[in-house]
Amino acid sequence: MTDITADAVDTRVIEPEDERYNATLIAREDQHESLAYFWVKFDGDPTPFEAGQYMTIGVFVDGKIVQRPYSIASAPSTARDGYEMYIRLVQGGTFTPLLWRLPVGARMRMIGPKGKFVLEPEDDRIHLFISSGTGNAPFVAMMRQALLDGAPRRAVFLSGVSYEADLGYRPLLEGWEAGGGYPVTYIPTVSRPGHPDNAGWTGRTGRVESIVGPVCEELGLTEANTVAYICGNPDMILAAEATLLERGFPEASVKKELYWPKGKEPQGATTSEIAANADE
């Protein structure tokens, strides 16, 4: 992992007060120096959302809003306590160096929710969740809400990262699996097994899209009994989708979270996908 210090690379002045702020950063928990969980709360009543949707959060710098969208990891039923987001610090990024400098209690602007990446209602098939990096957040929200509703659905959760330390929500997911709190099979994988930071890793290796086919074979996941949801790196999303389509999954059974920065559309994205993403 790269040791990143936000303060050392960003000197922009964040405006602490602005009449357009409507929320507060109420809590933060660091996983390590470049991954953290943030909780942001609206000033008034919470805005309802569906598990899988995202909020856009930001601050004002020189009178202009600097903001980015992030999937919500907390359950909709707990929105009154704030919206949880799992975020990576991007060195030289536009927004995250600002976010990393904010103290708990800082004022922010939050808008949303947006997004169509939500569970199909009344779908009793196995849920295959495929994520890379911080793309696991919407799935955690879905599972948390399912538990609160008393209706958890059988799930297989593939989580791909570069380093073992990057596995967000690992204790939660391992706890659900080991204790039977949620009917989930959790399968993490690291893509750089030879790196010193992964010296103690004994689990699966390779990019998460590379294990989709083998896991389907091992667990008997087919187009008849499984619906897939994919979130994370755009190129990963398209590669994982291609594997599932090759295995006979219909397009309607492969759900994708499609937001990426304008001008950074992945190779292979269709015109309709790019247009749909822009609409978000």
What are these regions (language model features)?
Residues 132-136:
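Ser/Thr-glycine-rich phosphate-binding loops at phosphate-binding pockets of nucleotides
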Residues 106-117, 206, 210-215:
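Helix-loop module immediately N-terminal to the HCX5R catalytic loop
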Residues 6-104, 191-192:
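Ferredoxin-reductase
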Residues 2-21, 158, 163-280:
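Reductase modules of NAD(P)H-dependent flavoproteins
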Residues 148-154:
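Conserved S-adenosyl-L-methionine
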Residues 138-148:
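Histidine-anchored nucleotide/phosphate-binding helix
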Residues 63-71, 115-122, 266-267:
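Short, Lys/Arg- and Gly-enriched loop/turn segments at beta-strand edges
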